[in-house]
A protein has these predicted regions:
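Histone-fold recognition with a strong bias for associated Lys/Arg-rich disordered tails
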Residues: 1-174
Length: 174
């Protein structure tokens, strides 16, 4: 059900939290873990994100804001409700779309539903929006301009007859 890549990321997030003696495993831990994957890097760059800066800001937030277990306390790291909801949303979305495997891109989209999380705040601060991520994952349409200064979305609009429906082209184009 979970892709190998996602399982590796989840293990990495738990390991980081355990080594840091963090009491909780948060949405920020999860986003930081999936940032290391090629797919998430590609998606965020296409949506205008600065991955190294985002990673640094997440690390800083985790270090400053995550409660730590006292020395000698051997309790296991506990995932927050937000962390659990993100994974549940990703699984539900994949199941409802008839697919079998949950990947890191599904988790990235699900993170945006945790609107009160610092992870979403940092993504939004870089003007990375859920819609941009979904459009890129679904259609490969980047919000970053090509060498001519046009985005794929702008090209679709320019070449559509009514500037809203890309499948309705003018006669000259057919």
């Amino acid at each position: 059900m979970l892709s190998n890549e996602l399982e590796t990321c989840l293990n990495s997030a738990f390991q980081v939290a355990r080594e840091g003696k963090h009491e909780f495993l948060t949405v920020e831990h999860l986003l930081l873990a999936i940032l290391d994957t090629p797919r998430v890097k590609e998606v965020l760059k296409a949506c205008g994100g600065d991955v190294p800066r985002l990673a640094a800001e997440l690390r800083e937030h985790i270090e400053q804001s995550t409660p730590r277990l006292p020395d000698g306390d051997e309790r296991e790291v506990q995932p927050t409700l937000g962390f659990q909801r993100v994974l549940q949303r990703a699984v539900f979305h994949v199941q409802s779309s008839g697919r079998k495997e949950v990947g890191v891109a599904n988790v990235l989209v699900a993170i945006f539903s945790e609107k009160q999380s610092h992870a979403v705040f940092l993504l939004n601060r870089q003007d990375v929006a859920r819609l941009d991520v979904v459009i890129y994952i679904s259609h490969g349409m980047s919000k970053i301009a090509d060498e001519r200064g046009e985005t794929k979305a702008a090209l679709v609009t320019r070449y559509s007859r009514d500037h809203q429906h890309p499948l309705m082209c003018t006669l000259e184009e057919t």
